[in-house]
Amino acid sequence: MRGYKQLKIPVLDAAGNPAWPEMFPVKRIEEMRDSVGHRHFMAQMMLQAVPPERTRLDPGALQFYDAEFDAAHCRLAGARMTGLAAYWDPSTGRRKSDGSVCVLIYRDDGARRAYLHDVRYLVVDDGDAHPLSRQCDMVLDFMHQHDLRRIAIETNGIGNALPEIMRDVAARRGANVYIQKIINTRNKETRILDAIEPLLTTGRLFAHTRLQGSPLMAEMMGWSPLGATGHDDGIDAVAGALMMTPYVLRPPGAAIRPFAANTNFKI
């Protein structure tokens, strides 16, 4: 391999013309840019890596809406929703501890859009003898408000005991809930960046107006992928909700398409 030369040809030249128009016409290139976001597009298709320290989560790039979910038609803000994700990233909930955050996201996978519908920061009194049980009550209130029956709980660390506590609290309230356990092993900054940045930079991350004055906005403004910039518990929970497999939404009474195998063959 001595004396080799490296050939680099970005998908677009300096004038914006495609290098291989028969394979990658302008329309397809724009679709790729919208799909993966600016950072991945520049690195993979333009061969220009964006330094991590230059990446930010600008709350001004959020598309705000003021509407509630229409369960009868599975619609939100004029769009048909295909799935939802309710996610709880827990902590002790004490005032000086990491934030304990519950998130609800709706998804329109046809348009590759996500709708950040509500974020609840859970805080319990420092003198509360049962802070985890109290938080479970708060999460059940959150679920009741949004007519939810299932939630994912991050079970790293303190969350390991929460599914059973949650079931006990729900049983006492006569609530029937389904709990999905989530274990995160990826670096937190990478997880946040990969989940949020592509949607945010392509105008496909929507947020309810109730969140405009929430701590989430300050977290986004102060966040850096280099870490150690302050609180990021809300955006970490949002990233978890975006990366989990969503629960499929169907309007009440919608028929489920049957699938049947063709067994009319000979061996």
What do these predicted ranges mean?
Residues 1-31, 48-52, 56, 108-227:
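Mg2+-dependent endonuclease catalytic cores in nucleic-acid-processing enzymes, primarily RNase H-like
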Residues 77-80, 93-98, 231:
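A short catalytic or substrate-binding loop motif that flags glycine-/basic-rich loops and adjacent residues
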Residues 101, 134-138, 236:
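Well-ordered alpha-helical segments embedded in enzymatic catalytic cores
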Residues 242-267:
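Acidic two-metal-ion nuclease catalytic site recognized across multiple nuclease folds
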Residues 90-92, 157:
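Short, glycine/acidic-enriched loop or turn micro-motifs at the edges of active sites
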Residues 96-110:
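Acidic, metal-ligating active-site segments
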Residues 227-243:
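Charged alpha-helix within mobile-element recombinases
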Residues 15-90:
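ATPase catalytic-site recognition across NTP-hydrolyzing enzymes
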